[in-house]
Amino acid sequence: TRKRFLKLKYYSIILQSRIRMIIAVTSYKRYLWATVTIQRHWRAYLRRKQDQQRYEMLKSSSLIIQAMFRRWKQRKMQLQVKATITLQRAFREWHLRKRAKEEKSAIVIQSWYRMHKQLRKYVYVRSCVVIIQKRFRCFQAQRLYKRKRESILTIQKYYRAYLKGKIERIHYLQKRAAAIQLQAAFKILKAHNLHRPIRAACVIQSYWRMRQDRVRFLNLKKNIIKLQAHVRKHQQLQKYKKIKKAAVIIQTHFQAYIFARKVLASYQKTRSAVIVLQSAYRGMQARKMYIHILTSVIKIQSYYRAYVSKKEFLSLKNATIKLQSIVKMKQTRKQYVHLRATALFIQQCYHSKKLAAQKREEYMQMRESCIKLQAFVRGYLVRKQIRLQRKAVISLQSYFRMRKARQYYLKMYKAVIIIQNYYHSYKAQVNQRKNFLRVKKAATCLQAAYRGYKVRQLIKQQSVAAVKIQSAFRGYSKRVKYLSVLQSIIKIQRWYRAYKTLYDIRTRFLKAKAAVISLQSAYRGWKVRKQIRREHQAAMKIQSAFRMAKAQKQFRLFKTAALVIQQHLRAWIAGRKQRMEYIELRHSVLMLQSMWKGKTLRRDLQRQHTCAVIIQSYYRMHVQQKKWKIMKEAALLIQKYYRACRIGREQHCLYLETKAAVLTLQSAYRGMKVRKRIKACNTAAITIQSKYRAYKTKKKYAAYRASAIIIQRWYRGIKITNHQYKEYLNLKKTAIKIQAVYRGIRVRRHIQHMHRAATFIKAMFKMHQPRIRYHTMRKATIVIQVRYRAYHQGKMQRENYLKILKAVNILQANFRGVRVRRTLRKLRIAATLIQSNYRRYRQQTYFNKLKKITRTVQQRYRAVKERNIQFQRYNKLRHSVIYIQALFRGMKARRHLKTMHIAATLIQRRFRALMLRRRFLSLKKTAIWIQRKYRAHLRTKRHLQFLRLQNAAIKIQSSYRRWMIRKKMREMHRAAAFIQATFRMHRVHMRYHALKQASVVIQQRYQANRAAKLQRQHYLRQRYSAVILQAAFRGMKTRRHLKSMYFSAILIQSRFRSLLVRRRFISLKKAAIFIQRKYRATICAKHKLRQFLQLRKAAITIQSSYRRLMVKKKLQEMHRAAVLIQATFRMHRTHITFQTWKHASILIQQHYRTYRASKLQRENYTKQWHSAVIIQAAYRGMKARQLLREKHKAAIIIQSTYRMYRQYCLYQKLQWATKIIQEKYRADKKKHKALQHTELRKAETCVQASFQDVNIEKLIQEQHQTSIIIQKHCKAFKIKKHYLHLRAPVVSIQRRYGKLTAVHTQAVICIQSYYRGFKVRRDIQNMHLAATRIQSFYRMHRAKVHYQTKKTAIVIIQNYYRLYVRVKTERKSFLAVQKSVRTIQAAFRGMKVRQKLKNIPKEKMAAIVDQSALYCYRSKGQDEAVRSEGVIIQEWCKASCLACSQEEYHSQSRAAVTIQKAFRRMITRKLETQKCATLRIQSFLRMAVYRRRRANSVQQKRAAVTLQHYFRMWQTRKQFLLYRKAAVVLQNHYRAFLSGKHQRQVYLQIRSSVIIIQARIKGF
């Protein structure tokens, strides 16, 4: 007992020293923490002061910069206003000057016109009436003649066309029959060649599939038999293991129950001894602590008094701070309310002004646009009027000149009496005519040269434009093809990569799973072994302790041991009987369970099999659906793209037409406006951008700086709080250990305080949230009100504007009607004047020009007739071509359907084979999976057996050790006298024996582990060899199959390539034949042209000789007819002149009255218009100045409000930061005080408790010890419970506080983000406005350039096309003329011969023959001379025609060569890309097959073949679509060309008729 007491004393001294050391360390830490916090706060205060000084400096500098910027802006605005005023003044002065000049010129012209108008009218009206009557009668006669001739020609034309069509139809049917026979022969030959290999391939495939199915079936049968055997074996083993396991569990539970009872009894005895020792130790500790507590009480009292005084001072301080904060809050609230009211008022004013300015701007823009449109319309009308005036001036000049000539003519007429004067005037007239004809010839030569030069230039431009268009089209087609190929490659790559990644992930997952399973098994084994070792060591320790305690009390327990042995014996006998009964019951239960489990397993297997079949069927269905969906989606995509392309083309055409119309209207006005405003806008934009960017960068820098400072402060605060929180946690842990009692009281107070704070925060937060909502609602209502008012104002302005616009439109319509009526009257007057002049002039040269006109009319009529014939021929050709194309497309579609059918049969065959393969692979996988499961089960079984043996060995060892302990205890009881010596010796012996046994166990385990490893290695070798054999066999099978598939694929590829080559060869052959035909046709045409020219020359010579004779006869007849016509004509002329004079006088009177009334109206309108223009200009200037002033004021208000808002935001941020810092600082102080108070309170309670314990200890020591233990446990439990109860609300409050702070920070962030967004949006709007202006100017310029380029290209194409049409029409007319000449010549010769034969008798035949021979001999020289001249003329004509045709041919051949080259390059590039793509795909597939050959090589190869097949099918389909698209494009171009040709012909006819009318009007 003395030794124990000394030990306890020693340990108590150590504890006291440790406690004092901990107290000292904690106090030192507190002082250190206090000093550090004071230093930190002081440094933060200094930093804050420096930041405030910097902010004040920055604020003053920014105010100075703002003031300077405002002054500069004001100066700039004043200068801009001055510049605009000067420009307006200059423009108005120039406009007024221009108007004055125009008005003066108009007045002069009008006065001159009025002076000469009345003099002219009478004569002109008379002559016009005469000429109109003449022309009308002539026109009627010509019309009747034309109708008759056209009807005759149309009948001839249709009959000839019918004959030609019939002949061509017969030729076409013959060719078609021959082609069909050739195709049938070729197909038969091809089918005959392919029949044998296809049949052989089918037989081989059937045999191969049969063999594969047989092998699979036999393998499956063997595997299923083996699996069934293994499963049954496994079931029997499981039954046996369950029985064995149950027996072992029952044994262990029974033994554990017996051992637990023994341990419980011993534990109760040791517990009572330990309680006695604890009570003694606590009494000693209490006595020692009393002296220490007395000294500490004095210190605590002094600390407590200081704490109380400090607390009172702090409470007063807190109250004053709170009062100050409330007062400040009220002041700031008042300021904020006042500022808010002012801000809202400013915002309302600003928004209203802004909206008014916006509406004003919109109205001004609309007004400007209306003014612009009005100006444009007025300008257009003025230009139109000027043109009309110019025409009127020209007509007046012509009338004036004509009047002069008329006067001259009248003078000459008066001098008819004098013959000499008349003769001289006649000679002068003849000379003038000759001069005029010379001048005309020279002018026509110059015009021809100039037009030729222009045409050559146009041809050059057209060729350049055609080259550009071709290059652009080729580039586009190549890009489209490349993109389509690239997309298909990307799709294939994605599919392949997805498949590859899936396979890699699967393999990795399986490897990881195996590794995890092995690691888990190893880890669990290690864990179990570790646990066993721990249990073994714990058992050893418990045994040693138990033996030490048992050695003292062994004698007492011998009786109880004997009784226990007897009880155990009886219990063992009863337990044995129960065990036997239990085993029998268990055996019967297990049999029933095994039967039931077998039944359930069979049911599950059947269900799994059915489920697998259903899943496979659904999977196949899914695969088919997926393929069908892909095909459907592809078809829909193609349709969609085609329709989109078609609609896009139509829309593009419409857009181009509308754009061209709009651009022609806009370009005139915009050109003038843009050039004026671009300079001013550029300069203004540059200055504004530079200033704005500088301002923006400064603003951003200030914002970033302020945000960085706030973030730094926030981050430092967080760091400080984290550090303080860590220190607080450390202090809290130490305080919990020392001050358990005081904490409860302090925690309650702290919780009350926190509860008050939380309620205060909640109230503030609740106040803040509705306030924010109220502000948002108020802002929204203000915005809605402003918008609504603006909308109403806009509506009113819109209504006013519409009224004004309606009135303006009515006025404009009336004015335009008046103007149009005036112009029509003027035109009518001018037309009557022109007609009178024309009739007067035509009286002199009417007869001579009638002849020329009839010739031209005949030529035109023949040309029209030939054109109609050619058009009908073209229509027939077109219909035949369309029919041939339809037949060819049908044949192509049939071929494609056949290929698709063959491909579908192949796909179905392959797919069925693939499905059979998949079924086999699924069965194979299930078999492998069952094998793996079975092997894993065997391994787990062996492992469980090993663990059971290990557990059994441990139990045997433990039972053996128990027996040994009991034996040793008996020996120890006998040797009670020599307890210490024998016990020590026995302990050493036992330790040695335990080590020996442990070493034996370790050796056994090691040997067992080694044997297991050897068995595992042997099994792995066998498995590896089996796997290698299986892999080799499978590889051999797959290689064979791959070879067969490879050869079949090569065969298919070769056949398919040969088919493609054949098709390409046929297409190239057709193209070559087509080109050859064209070339031969051109050569034949040239040859025929030469022949025709020769014949034409001969016909011309014959016609000239014939016409000479006919002209002599006609002249005589015409001379007689002319005398009669002149007499009748003179009589008719005198009758008509009287009527025309009468009508003319009436018309002149009417025109003069209307002219006087219109003149008065015009003068009134011009005066009103001038006054309105002056008023508008003054009003616009005034309004512009007002707008500028308002904008300037609004900008100043916005800047001031924005700066105020910025300063207010900064102030709020600083206020928020200071509040957070103050709250943190106060919370830290409160925590520190609370900790000090808890320490003092605990020390007091400890002193009181120790003092009470010392007083009561003398009376009842044993009772007090037990009561202290109970009280201690109860108090600890209660305190813990109370602490946990209080901790939950504190934690919830802390969380809420954290959430509130987070919400506050989020609100601040939201405000900042909203403000930044507002800034960014405003900047973007400004930028967007500037960009839209620049874009509009740029687009206008670009559209103008684009329109000009398009216009030039279209003009070039039109010219080129017109040339081509002209040459074609000339050629066709030439051929028709050639035929007609031949027919005429043949008829003429026949007629001549028949006449001669009739007239000449037989007797004179010899003389005629002699004379003809002499005549032939004489005329031979003349013929040769004429022929040589004709040949020269023909050569010259041929050379000119050949030059034109060669140029055209060369251009066409170049274009054809370039198209062919491009097509060949495209085909070669296509083939190369296809080859590259196929090679890449094959390489990827080979790599994949090579990597996965062991797993599923056959499946991969089949997939590759199917992929290739699908890819080729897709490629052929795509090629077919491309060819089809190209054919459609060519057809469209050809149709457009033909329609353009027709339009050109119509245009030429109209143009020729217009030229004839103009020539007639002009008198040439």
From Swiss-Prot:
<feature type="domain" description="IQ 20">
    <location>
        <begin position="949"/>
        <end position="980"/>
    </location>
</feature>
<keyword id="KW-0539">Nucleus</keyword>
<dbReference type="GO" id="GO:0005516">
    <property type="term" value="F:calmodulin binding"/>
</dbReference>
<feature type="domain" description="IQ 6">
    <location>
        <begin position="389"/>
        <end position="420"/>
    </location>
</feature>
<dbReference type="GO" id="GO:0005737">
    <property type="term" value="C:cytoplasm"/>
</dbReference>
<feature type="domain" description="IQ 1">
    <location>
        <begin position="31"/>
        <end position="60"/>
    </location>
</feature>
<feature type="domain" description="IQ 12">
    <location>
        <begin position="658"/>
        <end position="687"/>
    </location>
</feature>
<keyword id="KW-0963">Cytoplasm</keyword>
<feature type="domain" description="IQ 21">
    <location>
        <begin position="972"/>
        <end position="1003"/>
    </location>
</feature>
<feature type="domain" description="IQ 23">
    <location>
        <begin position="1045"/>
        <end position="1076"/>
    </location>
</feature>
<dbReference type="InterPro" id="IPR027417">
    <property type="entry name" value="P-loop_NTPase"/>
</dbReference>
<feature type="domain" description="IQ 26">
    <location>
        <begin position="1304"/>
        <end position="1333"/>
    </location>
</feature>
<comment type="function">
    <text>Probable role in mitotic spindle regulation and coordination of mitotic processes. May have a preferential role in regulating neurogenesis.</text>
</comment>
<keyword id="KW-0498">Mitosis</keyword>
<feature type="domain" description="IQ 17">
    <location>
        <begin position="827"/>
        <end position="856"/>
    </location>
</feature>
<feature type="domain" description="IQ 24">
    <location>
        <begin position="1095"/>
        <end position="1126"/>
    </location>
</feature>
<feature type="domain" description="IQ 7">
    <location>
        <begin position="439"/>
        <end position="468"/>
    </location>
</feature>
<feature type="domain" description="IQ 4">
    <location>
        <begin position="293"/>
        <end position="322"/>
    </location>
</feature>
<dbReference type="Pfam" id="PF00612">
    <property type="entry name" value="IQ"/>
</dbReference>
<feature type="domain" description="IQ 5">
    <location>
        <begin position="366"/>
        <end position="395"/>
    </location>
</feature>
<feature type="domain" description="IQ 25">
    <location>
        <begin position="1168"/>
        <end position="1199"/>
    </location>
</feature>
<feature type="domain" description="IQ 11">
    <location>
        <begin position="608"/>
        <end position="639"/>
    </location>
</feature>
<feature type="domain" description="IQ 13">
    <location>
        <begin position="681"/>
        <end position="712"/>
    </location>
</feature>
<feature type="domain" description="IQ 9">
    <location>
        <begin position="512"/>
        <end position="541"/>
    </location>
</feature>
<feature type="domain" description="IQ 2">
    <location>
        <begin position="220"/>
        <end position="251"/>
    </location>
</feature>
<keyword id="KW-0131">Cell cycle</keyword>
<keyword id="KW-0677">Repeat</keyword>
<feature type="domain" description="IQ 19">
    <location>
        <begin position="900"/>
        <end position="931"/>
    </location>
</feature>
<dbReference type="GO" id="GO:0051301">
    <property type="term" value="P:cell division"/>
</dbReference>
<feature type="domain" description="IQ 14">
    <location>
        <begin position="731"/>
        <end position="762"/>
    </location>
</feature>
<feature type="domain" description="IQ 27">
    <location>
        <begin position="1327"/>
        <end position="1358"/>
    </location>
</feature>
<feature type="domain" description="IQ 29">
    <location>
        <begin position="1452"/>
        <end position="1483"/>
    </location>
</feature>
<feature type="domain" description="IQ 16">
    <location>
        <begin position="804"/>
        <end position="835"/>
    </location>
</feature>
<feature type="domain" description="IQ 10">
    <location>
        <begin position="535"/>
        <end position="566"/>
    </location>
</feature>
<dbReference type="GO" id="GO:0005634">
    <property type="term" value="C:nucleus"/>
</dbReference>
<dbReference type="InterPro" id="IPR052318">
    <property type="entry name" value="CellDiv_DevSignal_Domain"/>
</dbReference>
<protein>
    <recommendedName>
        <fullName>Abnormal spindle-like microcephaly-associated protein homolog</fullName>
    </recommendedName>
</protein>
<feature type="domain" description="IQ 30">
    <location>
        <begin position="1474"/>
        <end position="1503"/>
    </location>
</feature>
<feature type="domain" description="IQ 15">
    <location>
        <begin position="754"/>
        <end position="785"/>
    </location>
</feature>
<dbReference type="InterPro" id="IPR000048">
    <property type="entry name" value="IQ_motif_EF-hand-BS"/>
</dbReference>
<feature type="domain" description="IQ 3">
    <location>
        <begin position="270"/>
        <end position="299"/>
    </location>
</feature>
<keyword id="KW-0112">Calmodulin-binding</keyword>
